[in-house]
């Protein structure tokens, strides 16, 4: 049962990124002109806490939830990150919805960490302006707009 390995995947030019929903795992792959796929880097923000039973993977209660939203351009990768204990979602689904936005260089270095006022699952990077758009649905759905430079300057 590999449903625990679900997450978000986006591409930008010849690179694609994967961010795990249930673990703090983020990676980048590049695709060559010959269509060879090469792992460029991978990061694990925190070690997963799980049990492995033959072909099954089960998260333990003290495992921290991972990434929900993912977007990238030619310089940066942005993700919404939960970091909450996964068991909280069993009691209240929205308890693990991210309140942190992380920015990484395309080389995988953390370059910004921003505390969000509202829980936000989805993130989109504008193609035309240096802005990020986040969707939050706490009481009703709203789109919040952030300047990319503000996120990159932020350090929690």
Spans of features found by a protein language model:
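Blade-level signature of beta-propeller repeat domains, shared across WD40, Kelch, NHL, RCC1
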Residues: 124-156
């Amino acid at each position: 049962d590999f449903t625990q390995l679900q997450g978000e995947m986006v591409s930008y030019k010849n690179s694609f990124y994967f961010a795990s929903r249930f673990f703090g795992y983020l990676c980048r792959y590049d695709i060559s002109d010959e269509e060879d796929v090469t792992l460029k880097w991978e990061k694990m923000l925190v070690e997963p806490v799980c049990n492995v039973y033959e072909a099954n993977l089960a998260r333990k209660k003290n495992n921290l939830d991972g990434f929900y939203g993912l977007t990238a351009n030619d310089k940066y990768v942005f993700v919404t990150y939960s970091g909450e204990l996964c068991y909280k979602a069993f009691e209240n689904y929205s308890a693990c919805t991210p309140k942190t936005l992380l920015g990484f260089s395309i080389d995988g270095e953390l370059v910004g960490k921003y505390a969000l006022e509202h829980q936000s699952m989805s993130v989109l990077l504008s193609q035309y302006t240096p802005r990020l758009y986040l969707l939050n649905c706490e009481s009703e759905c709203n789109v919040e707009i952030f300047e990319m430079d503000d996120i990159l300057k932020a350090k929690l």
